[in-house]
């Protein structure tokens, strides 16, 4: 695998409009060949998706997913630029896939890392800084370890950072980019709500023998 310099990554980004990490991955997959890397990005639908990511996506649809057994349900809003695209099979398929992803990820609370409140980040930082295995380490090293741990923990809370359940080689964010590139419009996951049957309801735990005994004395 060829070494990928920062300059060639920047050149590919300028040429395609794709993100830095996507460009780096494309070049690594293409042994540093700019032409092949550009083709790789187009095949993945990433190049064109990045160029459209700043456009306003105010149309779309709200989709639902009810898991087998009807114990988990999801409402999810997915936005695009036009009503025509929102009705199309590609968009509707993405809507279903992302809603299904939410159903499969009970720990996910936010769409993107930017949505995570500062107080949540600070709380995680405080917890990690107090770990026994960090005592006695230099502050600089401790801070670096904590940063890595927090980053990993926060990713677990973010929908777009999750490996796609149908293809774990890509994240949900990469899936959205791929479909956006194929469709030719900006696509955004706006919000979601996940429901679990009986969640939050306190149930009195009475064993069967006790219940029968109480019925006899009634």
From Swiss-Prot:
Instruction: Give the originating organism.
Output: Prochlorococcus marinus (strain MIT 9313)
- Gene Ontology cellular component terms for the protein in this record: cytoplasm
Localization of this protein: Cytoplasm
Q: Name one GO molecular function term.
A: translation elongation factor activity
The primary location reported for this protein is cytoplasm
UniProt superkingdom: Bacteria
Stored PROSITE patterns: EF_TS_1 (PS01126), EF_TS_2 (PS01127)
Return the protein name: Elongation factor Ts
Known function? Associates with the EF-Tu.GDP complex and induces the exchange of GDP to GTP. It remains bound to the aminoacyl-tRNA.EF-Tu.GTP complex up to the GTP hydrolysis stage on the ribosome.
Cytoplasm as UniProt keyword: yes
Q: Which family does it belong to?
A: Belongs to the EF-Ts family.
**What are the record keywords, sorted?**
Cytoplasm, Elongation factor, Protein biosynthesis
Identify the HAMAP family for this entry: EF_Ts
Q: Which PANTHER family match?
A: ELONGATION FACTOR TS, POLYPROTEIN OF EF-TS, CHLOROPLASTIC
- Per the record, which residues fall in region Involved in Mg(2+) ion dislocation from EF-Tu? 82-85
Which Gene3D superfamilies does the entry mention? 1.10.286.20, DNA helicase RuvA subunit, C-terminal domain, Elongation factor Ts, dimerisation domain
Q: Which InterPro entries match?
A: EF-Ts_dimer_sf, Transl_elong_EFTs/EF1B, Transl_elong_EFTs/EF1B_dimer, Transl_elong_Ts_CS, UBA-like_sf
């Amino acid at each position: 695998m060829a070494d990928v310099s920062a300059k060639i990554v920047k050149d590919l980004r300028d040429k395609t409009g794709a993100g830095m990490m996507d460009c780096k991955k494309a070049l690594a997959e293409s042994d540093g060949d700019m032409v092949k890397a550009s083709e790789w990005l187009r095949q993945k639908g990433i190049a064109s998706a990045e160029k459209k990511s700043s456009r306003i996506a105010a149309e779309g649809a709200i989709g639902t997913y009810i898991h087998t057994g009807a114990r988990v349900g999801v409402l999810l809003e997915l936005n695009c630029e036009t009503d025509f695209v929102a009705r199309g099979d590609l968009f509707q398929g993405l809507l279903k896939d992302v809603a299904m992803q939410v159903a499969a990820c009970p720990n996910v609370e936010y769409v993107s890392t930017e949505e995570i409140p500062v107080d949540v980040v600070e709380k995680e930082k405080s917890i990690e800084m107090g770990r026994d295995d960090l005592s006695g380490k230099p502050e600089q090293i401790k801070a670096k370890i904590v940063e890595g741990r927090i980053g990993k923990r926060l990713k677990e809370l973010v929908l777009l950072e999750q490996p796609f359940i149908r293809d774990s080689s890509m994240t949900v964010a990469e899936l959205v980019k791929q479909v956006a590139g194929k469709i030719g419009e900006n696509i955004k996951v706006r919000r979601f709500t996940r429901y679990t049957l009986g969640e939050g309801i306190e149930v009195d735990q009475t064993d069967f023998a006790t219940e029968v005994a109480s019925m006899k004395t009634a």
